[in-house]
């Protein structure tokens, strides 16, 4: 180029016992992501023991990402084991099934690989289908605007349900002075602090961002460790980072760096503006694109670089990057 006592038992019952809610998946059926962020694999049953926390329901993405050594992270990249991530409530189309795994197409992540969505394999238990949620996917929603945020079972915020990612979208049911009441894809309800999200009546209600809006969003994630295929506040890859920044501001761009480099409006290096995406390619910038960053002005860029590092700001002319510069694209109007 993701909790003992009475309160625990209540939480366990409400948020873990979804047998009746899980979709009985059939080919080309629609479903919704039922975990904070589902990690999609290139093939089913590819998990190592260390990957199990990413494949449960609920997931524990912090445990997964923080427990991996560098070599274990590099294995995901070098062996090309992962495809992308999909966030809680995101719609997918199920196109195949092998045992307990399903192949899905993630809506809203454009790719030339499939016009319906980004393909990948995931555990079936991380999907659900609820008609009430399906009926409200085009209604007013709350967009999570913090790197991650906590959903609560009740407005008193005494009992946590789960931690969700930036850019998660959930239908709004009601609100009080400090919280939004939202609908979860399994049909349950939860509360989100208003400080952690923004209400929109529709997708078109999201205002066109200024370049500084995109940059400030990117800066929220400074220091977040890289994760191959990541598109969430639990970790990004390079193109997942730029895709998510733009999408959270109402602009959908391709999921991967190659297609990102072929869309938008081409920009000469001497005319770079804040918010432009800048690309890097093999063979001294003349081969296939392998990396993307966002230009933030004054000769600097912000990016999620690779498994050894975290989201950072560095000069565009940094050795190792400037030699592979392969052009820029503008997606802002």
Curated annotation (Swiss-Prot):
Look up the coiled coil feature and give its residue ranges.
none
The catalytic activity of this protein is classed by the Enzyme Commission as: 3.4.14.13
Instruction: Name the chemical reaction catalysed here.
Output: The enzyme releases L-Ala-gamma-D-Glu dipeptides from cell wall peptides via cleavage of an L-Ala-gamma-D-Glu-|-L-Lys bond
Q: Which InterPro entries match?
A: NLP_P60_dom, Papain-like_cys_pep_sf, Peptidase_C40, SH3_16
Q: Which PROSITE patterns match?
A: NLPC_P60
The root-end lineage is: Bacteria, Bacillati, Bacillota, Bacilli, Bacillales
The UniProt keyword set, sorted, is:
Cell wall biogenesis/degradation, Hydrolase, Protease, Signal, Thiol protease
Q: NlpC/P60 domain location, by residue?
A: 208-332
Q: Does the keyword Membrane apply?
A: no
Per its UniProt entry, what is the enzyme's top EC class, as one word?
hydrolase
Keyword Hydrolase in record: yes
Q: Which GO terms describe its biological process?
A: cell wall macromolecule catabolic process; cell wall organization; proteolysis
Q: Which Gene3D superfamilies does this entry report, sorted A to Z?
A: endopeptidase domain like (from Nostoc punctiforme), SH3 Domains
Q: Which residues bind substrate?
A: 83, 118, 237-239, 256-257
This chain's protein is named Gamma-D-glutamyl-L-lysine dipeptidyl-peptidase
Cited function: Specifically hydrolyzes gamma-D-glutamyl-L-lysine bonds in murein peptides, releasing L-Ala-D-Glu.
Q: Name one GO molecular function term.
A: cysteine-type peptidase activity
Q: What residues form the catalytic site here?
A: 238, 291, 303
Q: Which gene encodes it?
A: ykfC
> Which Pfam families does the UniProt record give?
NLPC_P60, SH3_16, SH3_YKFC_2nd
- PANTHER family under this entry? GAMMA-D-GLUTAMYL-L-LYSINE DIPEPTIDYL-PEPTIDASE, MUREIN DD-ENDOPEPTIDASE MEPH-RELATED
Q: What family name appears in the similarity comment?
A: Belongs to the peptidase C40 family.
Describe its partners and assembly state. Monomer in solution.
Signal peptide positions are: 1-23
């Amino acid at each position: 180029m993701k909790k003992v006592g009475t309160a625990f038992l209540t939480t366990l019952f409400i948020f873990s016992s979804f047998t009746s809610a899980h979709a009985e998946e059939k080919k080309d059926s629609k479903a919704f992501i039922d975990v904070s962020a589902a990690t999609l694999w290139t093939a089913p049953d590819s998990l190592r023991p260390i990957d199990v926390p990413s494949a449960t329901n609920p997931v524990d993405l912090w445990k997964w990402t923080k427990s991996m050594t560098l070599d274990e992270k590099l294995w995901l990249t070098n062996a090309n084991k992962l495809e992308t991530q999909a966030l809680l409530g995101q719609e997918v189309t199920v196109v195949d099934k092998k045992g307990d795994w399903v192949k899905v197409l993630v809506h809203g992540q454009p790719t030339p690989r499939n016009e319906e969505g980004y393909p990948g394999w995931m555990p079936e238990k991380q999907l659900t289908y609820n008609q009430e949620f399906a009926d409200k996917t085009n209604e007013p929603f709350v967009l999570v605007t913090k790197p991650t945020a906590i959903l609560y079972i009740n407005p008193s915020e005494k009992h946590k349900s789960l931690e969700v990612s930036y850019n998660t979208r959930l239908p709004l049911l009601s609100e009080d002075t400090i919280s939004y009441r939202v609908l979860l894809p399994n049909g349950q309800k939860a509360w989100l602090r208003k400080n952690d999200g923004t209400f929109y009546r529709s997708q078109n209600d999201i205002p066109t961002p200024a370049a500084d809006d995109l940059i400030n969003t990117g800066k929220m994630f400074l220091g977040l460790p890289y994760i191959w295929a990541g598109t969430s506040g639990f970790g990004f890859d390079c193109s997942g980072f730029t895709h998510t920044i733009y999408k959270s501001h109402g602009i959908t761009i391709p999921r991967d760096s190659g297609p990102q480099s072929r869309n938008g409006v081409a920009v000469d290096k001497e005319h770079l503006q804040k918010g432009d995406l800048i690309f890097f390619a093999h063979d001294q910038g003349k081969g296939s694109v392998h990396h993307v960053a966002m230009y933030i002005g004054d000769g600097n860029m912000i990016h999620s670089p690779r498994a050894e590092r975290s989201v950072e700001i560095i000069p565009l002319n940094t050795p190792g990057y400037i030699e592979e510069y392969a052009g820029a694209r503008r997606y802002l109007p």
